[in-house]
Amino acid sequence: NARNRDRYKEFQKFADINRDGRLSEEELDRRDGLRLIKGSNIPWIDDTADGSKGSGLMHHKFMVIDNQVVVLGSANFTMSDIHGDFSKPETRGNANNLLRIDSKELANHFKKEFNIMWGDGPGGKPDSLFGIKKPSRKIDYLIVGGAQIRIKFSPDPEDTPREQTSSGLISTAIAGTKQSVDMALFVYSDQFISTILGERQRDNVQIRTLVDSQFAYRDYSSTLDMWGLQSTQDCKTGKSSVWKQPLKTVGIPNLASGDLLHHKFGILDRSLILTGSHNWTHAANHTNDETLVAIQNETVASHYQREFERLYQGATFGPTAKLVQATSKTCDERVKSKPQSNTEESN
């Protein structure tokens, strides 16, 4: 598809060291990350190792180092996501977050998740499990350095009680807020979370939301609920999730051209953060391999608050005129002319 073609063109420009328009074996040995891994005899598998063609997305972004240190967050380990596009020097890299946590107990939880997917590694038995083939796991609780941490790995089957899923953890945390909810999200389309947020708004909880510009104005985005507009999700379910008191604090950040808001975090009452690889979507909850952590700690929350304020300053708020016009059409017209895209989980 066009997205993959663009990615390959970007890689070509980066790997073509002598600029002759061709990629030599020497250039690939120096610039191709997977080739470097293979050349170093580091074992690797992908999410087809369970015998499938890759179910959903292997969307994790974590490392476990020496069974002691965990690195996790929203950042893909790519040049574009962290540093910016090689061919576009004006880009700065996507807006992301990473956490480094030194805890053997936490590392054990992530090592278990890794081992479920790894099985016995390349070759050998077909015992790797990805996506919906993995067993459902409960929410785990632990204390690290005075911080209360909850961990949840996805996906969960569709019939799993909502509160036991990752999106359920998000919803439960939001339901307990008293003062504020600030969210910076790549994509946001979970209607149940939107409903819980609407309930908190009616109880005078201050809500501010930033969503990446690629998704904020999509017909199915839950930003539409917050703006008082009907989404195509409402059309399909026949239930209205439209907020009766539209928000003026929902919009998109102004980033360098080509950069994305790739965060997947929420800050609740300036003391609890929700972060990880988990986009706030149905696919993240029930299809993809994902990580979600909830950390109760004011110091950690203050770092995320600073990042949110940086993005919020100068943001563009409210729906576009084009979106308002589009939502004025009947549901039949909208659903038939513009089916929901499946690209929401590509990051």
Please report, for each region that a protein language model flagged, where it lies by residue.
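A short helix->loop->beta-strand "cap" motif at the edges of active sites that frequently abuts
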Residues: D203-I207
